Amino acid sequence: MSWLTGSVQGASTTFQLGCSVLIAVSLVTAKPVKGQGVALERAPQFLPTTATNVKQSHRLPTLLQATIDPAHQSTLAPAHQLTIAQSIPPNVAPQQLPREPSPPSTQPPPASIPAPLPPLDQLLPLPGSQPIVPFENTLETITVDRFEVVGSTVFSAAEFAKITEPFTKRPLAIVELFQLRSAITQLYLDKGYITSGAYVPPQTLQRGVVTIRVIEGKLETITVTGTRRLSPNYVRSRLAIATRAPLNRDQLLKALQLLQLDPLLQSLSAELSAGTRPGESVLSVQVTEASSLSTQLIFDNARAPSVGTNRRQIQISQGNTTGLGDRLSASYTNTSGSNAIDLSYVLPLNPRNGTLSFSYGSASSSIIEPPFDVLKIESKARYYELAFRQPIVQTPTHELALGLTATHRQSEATLLDGLIPFPALGADPDGKTRLAALRFFQEATWRSSREVIALRSQFTVGLNALSATINPDPPDSRFFSWRGQAQWVRLLAPDTLLLLRGDLQLADRPMLPLEQFGLGGQDSVRGYRQDALLADNGLFASAEVRFPILRLPKLDGLLQLTPFIDLGTAWNLGNALDPDPRTLVAVGLGLRLQYSDRLTARLDWGIPLTDINGAKNTLQENGLYFSIVIRPF
């Protein structure tokens, strides 16, 4: 449901060149992520009148392509004012270190384009009414004072009384008795219980009471065929939770729809047939697996100029590593001044799509932007994360999930090829920062054929654990923050989309650079350099419309014009000064090219409406952003 395509910002520390040189001279010695007998009629098999055989190859359209930078950046901001700073050219703004590794807990997944769900009427068609079985002595009548319906776990006696009352206290032909039985069966059918129904067992009329027995249908077994690497139990277990007795058509339909939306499956066919015992059925499912191996090649200018804006990235993901539906992903990112690697493993825990995931990332960077390159500023960072996510509500159109993430992040920066520790905000005397935190998150998604709404909330508690940085005064690893993110994608016309995004962070105290909120860059306020503003709290909003201007049906290609407006504001807590300016506003225009699901290319031009000091040596700093995403397979 993109989740929020806005880049989740890291943090940083800043200082001016004069201070850096003075420290370099005076501190050269410093240390561097849960009883039947013969009856009036035989106990029937309540099944659809025709076998159900559905074959689907419907696939959801590709996700909105949002380049979420998992890379690693930190920023330098003024901290000291010394006379030697006069040697810096006046048009050069405080420059940036690479942002620290950005773990998955700060990167919500992109939402998909609104798309129709697999049609229900092609899955399990509603059966016709049960036929009345011919029998002898149709002119015989009886008088019934009361009917007793037994064997039902679905309907109450009061609900059955509404159906049986017109057949009591009067002479009743035997044929009417069977009409009543059929009416009770129809009640089940109308509520989706297509393999349940009623029959009249053998009995002697006593005290004017006739017993009608209900057989509530259930599955005898689920057979799965067509799997290659994927375990059949992956499919079977997800259908089993929706097919508990009594078997309900609507619940089975929803389970089949959810299964068809699973990226591990390309197509699905299902057939319901009679089992070996009365009231039992066999569900046969034929699946075709989708390719579980995917790769992405990304080239853009989404990194900070201090380490080189041009980013090269390769991502490889295996969605079914061991046959359990477990996903293993790896990515490598490179710029002229940085290298980063990110690994993740996601293991399904239960048929309700609960998952346990582990993520690791590591990055090393060097400042290559003049005039700061002479200081030989280097940084290293890594994160570890362990996360549990469990959908609480899951339907083809809505999902509500809760999760908990334990994260550990650490960074280290030095000057002069590692000779002097970098005096980062909140760092220890060795220039190191360590953070341990628990994140409790909530995610909600609503989708229809015309819109997708995605919401994400996350509460983070910083901990004094795992050698975390603890200082006499903040910032350190002890903090509390809340982050809320939202996205609404609306289909206005064919291939015409409205995309609204929002992002808000509120903290209770000054934050370590690792947890600060950033504004500026390709996935934030376009028109400014990456992370032009960094602060403890922040708000970001964006509106974008995508208009088709060229369609290439033979090539499955689409070119869209994308006008947009971005704005954001950031502010600090405690004694730290607010950024100046604290608000960024920009408008702009872009082109977006989509070629099948193999290529997505984008070019944006952001026009800043708020002036900000700084050099304009790169395309990014002049408001131009490009992105090319290639998916070979």
Residue spans of the language-model regions?
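Repeated loop/turn-to-beta-strand initiation elements of outer-membrane beta-barrel proteins
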Residues: 293-295, 322-328, 351-356, 365-366, ...
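Transmembrane beta-strand segments of outer-membrane beta-barrel domains in Gram-negative
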Residues: 355-511
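Residues that define the transmembrane beta-barrel architecture of outer-membrane proteins
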Residues: 279, 308-312, 337-341, 380-384, ...
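Extracellular loop and loop/strand-boundary signature of outer-membrane beta-barrel proteins
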Residues: 301-302, 329-330, 370-375, 417-430, ...
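Transmembrane beta-strand segments that form the barrel wall of outer-membrane beta-barrel proteins
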Residues: 270, 293-303, 314-318, 324-336, ...
